[in-house]
Amino acid sequence: MISRCRFSFVFSVVSVFGLLSLVNVLADNSSLGSLQGDACVPVVDNGNVRFRGSLQNSFHKFSTEKLGHVVFLGGSITEMEGYRPRVVEWLTKRFPETQFTFTNAGIASTCSHTGAFRLERDVLNHGPVDLLLVEFAVNDDQDAHHSADDCLRGMEGIIRHVRRYNSRSDIVMIDFVNPEMLATAQLGNTQLSVAQHERVARHYEISSIDLPAELADRIAAGSITWETFGGTHPGPLGNQMAADLVAEVLSAGWSVAAASAESVGAHLEPAEPLIATCFDHGKFVPAESIRPGDGWQHGIPEWKSIAGSQRERFAGKAFFHCTQPESTLSFQFSGQAVGAYVLAGPDAGQLEVQIDDGSWNTVELYHAYSGGLHYPRTVMFATGLSAGNHEVKVRLAKTHPEKSKGTAARILNFAVSE
């Protein structure tokens, strides 16, 4: 068990990369002091960098078993050569005898919904996760424009699914920052996606880093600017700052683990989720389960004849696509939510969707970023369905959004959650 002591002090943390940060730790009900003896152990807790729960399992795995599977899950901030390789370098130096497997599960533009549905394919199929570093606050905000409930559905779904697959998985959540999120933090408030993801972190006792608030504090102190941080996709200084904060919270957690007699074990899951319709059983529907009608094809599109750029990761992929209005496909599934992971380009149209012989509803594929790019996004057909089996019919609409140049649908995967 962790001892708590009623003592206030300021201690300095020198990161492994040489950046010095002063962290005020007030040993009340949320933070601990650092004293000689066994009464207290040091913990990072400055209001923006929050150590919660336990990192005992990853510490034991890395230091004793000398094996470790570390997963980085998120959008382009994760996919790019940014904070992630810096953390990889730090971990390999911190545990030089440990055989690590590092999984880069970042996909640019994707939100927490896509993350929840692709989790099985991109993360869990690579083996049990010892340490997960996850970020989706920026894309849930600026790309998906998620509601409060939708922010929870994706992020909570990820956490619950990871922990159901391996109840010993340690998790750290990093909330990155864009200009609007920074401006909100500078006013003393919290952007919706950050606030909702932090609710998930508190509910599951997951350590987290509120980068918008931390950056706002450092800008106010005159130690950094938005420009030197590097923007939404951070530059070298911003990525170093994020990596240092990750190193600090991990080091704090592992200091607790090293000083504790607590053994490794399962993380306790709350009896109830924050939102019952979270995507904690998210997965993609196998292509062979889809029944395409005339007009639908499964294969690689003739990209050279299609306007708009596409990212390399999608260029050679086969998937269902159609440009012929009123063409229909269908499939059956068991679960409470259904949608599609799509590429929405300059000619993206609309889908008409019917579930269980109900009314036909229109689903927009075109996105604000579709003008010159076949943009990856997840669109939901329905959430909160009754448990059990359902049938979905999908029809390409004759109409299309005003800004779109066509009626195309390019569906990478259909997605469901039980």
Show where each model-derived region lies.
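Extracellular serine-dependent O-acyl
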Residues: 30-33, 170-176, 191-227, 240-254
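Solvent-exposed loop/turn segments at secondary-structure junctions
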Residues: 76-79, 107-112, 137-143, 169, ...
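Active-site segments of SGNH/GDSL-like serine hydrolases
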Residues: 138-139, 159-195
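Alpha-helix N-cap and loop-to-helix initiation/capping positions
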Residues: 146-154, 185-192, 230
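Oxyanion-hole/transition-state-stabilizing segment in secreted/luminal serine hydrolases
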Residues: 63, 71-73, 83-90, 114-152
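Structural recognition of the beta-strand scaffold that forms the well-ordered cores
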Residues: 69-73, 101-106, 130-136, 170-175, ...
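N-terminal secretory targeting modules
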Residues: 1-73, 78-100, 127-128, 223, ...
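Alpha-helical scaffolding segments of alpha/beta enzyme cores, especially the outer helices
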Residues: 89, 150-153, 157-164, 196-199
